[in-house]
A protein has these predicted regions:
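Glycine-rich adenosine-cofactor-binding loop
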Residues: 3-22
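NAD(P)-binding Rossmann-fold cofactor-contacting core
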Residues: 25-47
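Short, solvent-exposed amphipathic alpha-helical segments in soluble enzyme
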Residues: 22-27, 86-88
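Short glycine-rich anion-binding loops that position phosphate/pyrophosphate groups of nucleotides
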Residues: 14, 74-77, 209
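Structural signal for interior beta-strand "rungs" in well-ordered beta-sheet cores
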Residues: 96-211
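Phosphate-bearing ligand-interacting subdomains
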Residues: 42-102
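Short amphipathic alpha-helical segments
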Residues: 19-21, 50, 81-85, 127, ...
C-alpha cells in the first residue's frame, strides 16, 4: 500500500533512520512523502529539531484516507501488538524498499516490510508482513522470514533458512543453510546458528573476553 502520505509509527533511533530512507524512496517515487511521526511520547524528537514532527499519539491516531504506516519498531512483539491495534482501526501499512536494496525478480515482499539500504533478498526469498531487514543484511535463496520478525544490521540468512513469526535476530548473526527457527525465538548478536532453534528459545555465542588490559 503506497498511500498519499506516509506516517512513521515510533519516534526512536530507528525512526530517525527511516525518515532519511523514506525520503530517498519518496525521491525515487516509490513511497509517499512522510507527513510525520506518531508516538505516545510527544517529546520523543525534542532533541532533534527539524527532523520531523510528532503529529499525534498511537493511542489517538485514526487513519485518514490514503494514509500508509511504516513501523519504526524493532521488537517483534511490540510490532505485532501495534499492527493488531492499528489494523483494527482500518490502518494500512506501507512497504519500504530502499533504492539501494537488491531484490531478485522472484523475491516476495509483503506489506509493511522495511528493506533498509544495501539489504538483499535473493531468488525466491520471502519476506513476510511487517518484517524489518536492516542495513547490509541478506535473505538467501528460498529463505523465508515470518511476519513481524526483525533482522538487525549485517545479518546473513543463507539458502532455505526458515524463520517463524516474531523472531529477533541480533546484529552480525549468521544462520546456515536449511536451519529452521521457531516463532518468537531470539538469536543473539554475532551468533552462528548450525541447528534448528525451537520456538521461544534464545541462542547466542560466547561474548568477547578480555585477554590483556593495557
Amino acid at each position: 500500500m503506497a498511500g498519499k502520505r506516509t506516517i512513521i509509527v515510533g519516534g526512536g533511533g530507528f525512526a530517525r533512520e527511516l525518515l532519511s530512507w523514506a525520503a530517498d524512496c519518496a525521491d525515487a517515487g516509490t513511497l509517499a512523502p512522510v507527513a510525520g511521526v506518531i508516538d505516545d511520547n510527544a517529546d520523543v524528537l525534542a532533541d532533534y529539531p527539524g527532523v520531523a514532527s510528532v503529529i499525534g499519539s498511537v493511542a489517538d491516531y485514526r487513519p485518514e484516507p490514503g494514509d500508509a504506516l511504516l513501523l519504526a519498531i524493532g521488537n517483534p512483539e511490540t510490532k505485532r501488538r501495534l499492527v493488531e491495534q492499528l489494523s483494527a482501526r482500518g490502518a494500512g501499512f506501507a512497504k519500504l524498499v530502499h533504492p539501494t536494496a537488491v531484490l531478485a525478480r522472484t523475491a516476495r515482499i509483503e506489506d509493511g516490510a522495511v528493506l533498509c539500504p544495501l539489504s538483499l533478498v535473493s531468488a525466491h526469498g520471502h519476506v513476510g508482513r511487517c518484517v524489518t531487514v536492516n542495513a547490509l543484511s541478506s535473505v538467501g535463496h528460498d529463505a523465508k522470514v515470518g511476519a513481524f520478525s526483525t533482522l538487525s544490521a549485517h545479518v546473513d540468512l543463507t539458502g532455505f533458512v526458515q524463520l517463524g513469526e516474531g523472531v529477533m535476530v541480533g546484529t552480525g548473526a549468521k544462520v546456515v543453510p536449511g536451519v529452521k527457527v521457531g516463532d518468537g525465538a531470539v538469536i543473539g548478536a554475532g551468533a552462528t546458528v548450525y541447528r534448528n532453534v525451537p520456538a521461544g528459545a534464545t541462542v547466542y555465542s560466547a561474548p568477547a573476553k578480555l585477554l590483556k588490559a593495557r
